[in-house]
């Protein structure tokens, strides 16, 4: 999938991607941030082609997914809008029975309605307990509701890797009441920011009982946690 070997070892589904690429690609589906489809073909020709070359492609399922869009099967790929191109590509990918689905900025080019519909379809039409979906995206807030695990990376280095369940237990966000701001800060938050003029403090491995009397406590949104971890990592590098 374009990864460059620098150090260490890598296995995907128990296979070495460098030695067992042919076997691996039978079990892996991948969509990049740019949908590349033959522009001279019609939509129907693309579907027939994929049906002929990929043994795990389910044409009927693809047509069902495609029927929820405004894409006509008689249309040439070259006349499709960017959003339609992505929808067509995703319809094909989601109709392939693969154990691992890798999505790189999958909703790039789609408007808000289609982005929400896509993730809803992803869970309803593709995911089951035997499949894994790996999503690489900068639009963190869009995928929070479908995540089971999260990996934050900064300049090629993993700075956080944990389950969402564990993250929600480990990190807490406090909006302290005005009278308790200084007391809250004395508990050593790992990050703080202003939101509409109000202090928001992020704590790691701090008991909720120590915070609950100081203001409003809740697990942070993934996007807010991401920004906080990136800022914290940057300061550590610069120190």
Language model: regions and residue ranges:
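C-terminal coupling/interaction segments
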Residues: 191-239
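Short, surface-exposed beta-strand/loop "edge" segments at domain boundaries and coil↔beta transitions
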Residues: 101-106, 180-184, 207-212
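ABC transporter nucleotide-binding domains
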Residues: 1-141, 145-148, 154
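ABC transporter nucleotide-binding domain
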Residues: 117-203
């Amino acid at each position: 999938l374009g990864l460059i070997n620098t150090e260490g070892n890598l296995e995907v589904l128990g296979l070495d991607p460098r030695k067992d690429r042919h076997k691996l690609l039978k079990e892996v589906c991948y969509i990049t941030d740019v949908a590349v489809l033959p522009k001279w073909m019609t939509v129907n020709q693309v579907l027939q082609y994929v049906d002929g070359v990929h043994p795990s492609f389910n044409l009927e399922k693809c047509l069902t997914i495609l029927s929820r869009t405004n894409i006509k099967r008689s249309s040439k790929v070259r006349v499709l809008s960017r959003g339609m191109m992505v929808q067509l590509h995703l319809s094909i990918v989601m109709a392939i029975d693969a154990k691992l689905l890798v999505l790189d900025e999958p909703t790039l080019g789609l408007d808000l309605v289609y982005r929400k519909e896509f993730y809803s379809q992803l869970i309803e039409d593709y995911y089951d307990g035997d499949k894994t979906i790996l999503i690489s995206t900068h639009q963190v807030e869009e995928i929070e509701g479908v995540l089971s695990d999260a990996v934050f990376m900064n300049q090629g280095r993993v700075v956080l890797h944990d389950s969402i369940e564990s993250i929600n237990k480990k990190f807490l966000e406090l909006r302290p009441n005005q009278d308790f701001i200084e007391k809250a800060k004395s508990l050593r938050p790992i990050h703080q920011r202003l939101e509409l003029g109000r202090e928001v403090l992020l704590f790691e491995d701090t008991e909720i009982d120590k915070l609950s009397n100081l203001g409003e406590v809740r697990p942070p949104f993934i996007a807010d946690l991401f920004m906080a971890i990136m800022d914290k990592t940057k300061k550590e590098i610069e120190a």
